[in-house]
């Protein structure tokens, strides 16, 4: 899309390029005070920007879109587009007096479109709920914007977006009109890729989608210009015509199956491997890659050579011309001419000059001995070929466009972008420039554009090494100047006279000069036209008219550059053909007329006059005798390198001319006498010649021809100073001389001939005086012009010197100010550096202190955790060892009793039970010690105590009475309220890593023995709490009623007081105590008072009824045993009452015979309550005795749960 040759959006009518409103930006330098005053006057709010117009400038195809798309574009501008950031930049630049940067860039537009598409895709709406037309419009704009940027990844993404549009249109039938936009966008993408054939096919598909409909949706917004298309179909036809012309215009390969047809032009691509160029008589140029030409020739013209195409019909379809030239290029800049056909009706070029001269000299000889007649009338173009092309014009255009133009653009660029600012901007826009210049132009004379933009060793980029194309690219990408009215990719209209438009036009002429003009040359008319346009551009850019005149007037030798300097200006190596052309000019080889006669100048003035712009007069030569062959030979000898025979003829001519010049310099009083003598001698000589030999006639004709040829040369050298009347006079002289040859030597004829000869000499003298006068006049004018130029140069130099002095003083002041600023900054930096060092030292010392503290605290924490675990271990082992000692004492006592009574089964069962308890306690001691030691070792290794699993404290041993009943094989009897319970004192769980007691019951430590696990009072959890998430709330009134039943001798108030004391002693709550535990605690509180009341009643009984003891002779003598039996009976009666009225401890509801279950330990529960408890816990909720369920051990007697 960056090619200047692509003009897809420009109409063929030149009036279309002109717009009614001219936007000419003039930057005037203003003083600082005036700028400050303007800053105060400018309002804070930026002026509104026409968003649609800015988008049209960036995306040119929008102007050709149908009317039905623009509502969606306006919706995008109103809802999803914002110019706030751009307007701030515009306001800032306008306040600073700089040129305003374009309000919209292609990158910013692509970013906005991406955000809008992302918002639509992020919504969770269905395809029927979103605005499909708006979504398709955004996809189309995004694809066209990516096509405008024309990167490789952008082309792939644009192709995907157009494919998404096609899929969405096929799914929703309401947006079929957008299908033409899909093919239109794909056609634009193909054009950007130089794939014009594919683009043409896509445009035709878009045209087919529209069909013959008259829908207003496809109309284009009306404009003032009547030549612009009014419908989208007309716009497509214009694109089709432009694409067809580009297929022929662009120098791309004409082979249809060429794989590289989508690449850049052949002449502009520096990586091609050779090409062929065919030109016909109608100036059609067709290009083929070298490989493609071989394939094409073998396919359609097998066995034919390249020279066989000479004279054949043009390969371009519809062209009636014939092939006249074929070029082959293997290396860039070196062209080989395979064949070239020269026709009589064509102009002679530099290449076919030799062939034309040979054709002229190969005329057949005639036997007629007739004196040749010379016709000095001007000739037409069709009779004798003349020179059409002059590469002198080419080099003058090369100098003014590439050398002078590049210098002017560099000067403007340096003023707007100094080297320091340029380096900063290049670093900012490095990502933007890298895809264009990082891998191109590897054969650049200075190493490539990327090497120039980003030189090594952190040097500043030098703009004096930038060529014109690179300067244009930097102006475009760095936003140095505003974009032209139609953007950077379109040819600016004639009404656009901005700097950016002129620079763009200058680059266009550069491309034309190095492609078309270099290959085909140009005429004088084309040279004058291009010179006028380029001069206007350079004058607007700031170049002086005197410098332009100097370039045009000076010869090539004075303005030529060497090979290396010209390579820097061109940006690429100078082609070989240009080098050969320059060498020819520098050696002094100039174009000559077709007659081949050498110009012999009388004075040095004639050479100077010829170098400026010598006109070429055209004459027709009628060849009718053998004398013409002699003339042609003389011409050939003079025009080419002189041989031995031609040297003599040239000397004779020079002697004749020297004699003639001497005669002209004689005084006027001797002219008549000399003319009479010469006339007499001439007449006598003619009589002798006519009488003796015919050869003398040839000599005379040669003499006359020499005079006439001198007259022709002099007239040509005098820039047409010899008028047509003078030529008629010469013609009359020749006719008179020829008439004299045919007379019979009469005296009248002799006199007539003498007068004519005298008239001829006088005319010649007149011309000599005219030449001298014009020479003096020209030299005087030249001196005056030189004086004026020198004065102008002196004035300009004085101005430059004054400007340089002012600038130097200003720069010196700036240098001093910068030095002071640098010094202040250095002082501030040193001060801050010292502060930073102090802060760094303080921070390092603080960090070191805190690290030491952290290490000390870590070691202390480790030691504390180890000590904590050791204390826990020793405390737990201490109580277990005390339990072990008590158990051993009990075992020794029971063993002693069993030894004294060997037949007692009760004592044997007691011995076995105490042995099992001792073994269980010892296993628990070993297990606890092992677990604590393992945790201590892990803490020492670095593990945190909070991350370690809690230590499981073993439960206390079961009750010995239960074990005795199990060993005896009897059903268990409910344990007494006054049975002592062996428990391990529990420790408070201070550390989160240790749990005091296990919630789940552990398996028995000895096989074959079922252990009961009475829960400690402080940590007992009610069974219902295990089944339910909330703790069991005991009904206060129900507990009081049951205590009244258990202790009938106590009043309700006394039982309430005892229960309140028990609640206070257990943390204001008895929710964790079972009913048996509550009864046991209350009995311990009632026992002291009961003993006191019994003593009082005993004393009263002994005194009141003394015969009471005698009535019972069988009573035991021990009061304690009696008391015990009475207690047992009382307990038995209370148990019977409790068996009838005791509730279920799980749900605290009354028991009924229908759903009653009794465990082996004689505790009763509801069947629906105890079964879930046993499935989860496996122990009795009251005594913690391990119970086997029938499902686990069907044959075991303890697994039966009898029902009452």
Curated annotation (Swiss-Prot):
It comes from Mus musculus. It catalyses: S-ubiquitinyl-[E2 ubiquitin-conjugating enzyme]-L-cysteine + [acceptor protein]-L-lysine = [E2 ubiquitin-conjugating enzyme]-L-cysteine + N(6)-ubiquitinyl-[acceptor protein]-L-lysine. Pfam families: HEPN_DZIP3 (PF18738), TTC3 (PF24525), TTC3_9th (PF24905), TTC3_DZIP3_dom (PF19179), zf-RING_2 (PF13639). InterPro entries: DZIP3_RING-H2_finger, HEPN_DZIP3, TTC3/DZIP3-like_helical, TTC3/DZIP3/RBM44-like_helical, TTC3/DZIP3_dom, Znf_RING, Znf_RING/FYVE/PHD. This is E3 ubiquitin-protein ligase DZIP3. Keywords: Coiled coil, Cytoplasm, Metal-binding, RNA-binding, Transferase, Ubl conjugation pathway, Zinc, Zinc-finger. A zinc finger (RING-type) spans 1144-1184. It is an enzyme of class 2 (transferase). It comes from the Eukaryota. Pathway: Protein modification; protein ubiquitination.
